[in-house]
A protein has these predicted regions:
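Short, flexible/disordered intra-domain loops and linkers
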Residues: 4-6, 115-123
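Oligomerization/assembly interface segments of phage tail-like spikes and tubes
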Residues: 98-114, 131
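Short histidine-centered beta-strand/loop micro-motifs
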Residues: 94-98, 120
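Small/polar-rich, solvent-exposed N-terminal microdomains that initiate assembly or binding
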Residues: 1-93
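Generic low-polarity alpha-helical segments
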Residues: 20, 24, 85, 106, ...
Length: 140
């Protein structure tokens, strides 16, 4: 077995990072929660302002609100919510030394005045819930 192509080497982490980013940017719930800083980001029209809220092209959020490096986009002049994904806590699998076991950590930041969506929902927790549905127990 060519050990350079196994999960034991950090070289595969780049591919895994892009797999995570792709899964996030293709999910409309995540994209809408990040893009639309409104009380109901899931509606096609904001009920308060009447502005259209079309589906979001997730590629526009990469390196701005969906981050694969632990640094927030510098040029932003507007309030935005962010997701940063990083790998953490690496250990070699004792049963299969060709694999490293790690934790994928998602850091979520939202402007304080955009947390409350309605009487029952908080934006960062809805983002966490959706990330959990997309990744918990799922292979990359």
């Amino acid at each position: 077995m060519n050990i350079d192509n196994t999960q034991r080497r950090f070289a595969v982490m780049g591919n895994n990072t892009f797999t995570i980013a792709n899964r996030l940017m293709t999910d409309q719930k995540i994209c809408r929660l990040l893009k639309y800083q409104t009380k109901d980001p899931f509606k096609s029209i904001d009920p308060i302002t009447g502005n259209k809220q079309p589906d979001v092209d997730g590629i526009d959020l990469i390196h701005k609100q969906i981050l694969i490096v632990p640094k927030v986009f510098d040029d932003s002049t507007e309030k935005m919510s962010y997701i940063v994904s990083v790998f953490d806590d690496f250990t070699v699998d004792q049963l299969n030394p060709d694999f490293k076991i790690s934790t994928v950590r998602f850091d979520i930041a939202c402007p304080y005045d955009e947390w409350i969506l309605n009487e029952q929902s908080l934006r960062p927790y809805l983002i966490m819930e959706r990330i959990d549905q997309l990744f918990n127990g799922q292979p990359l």
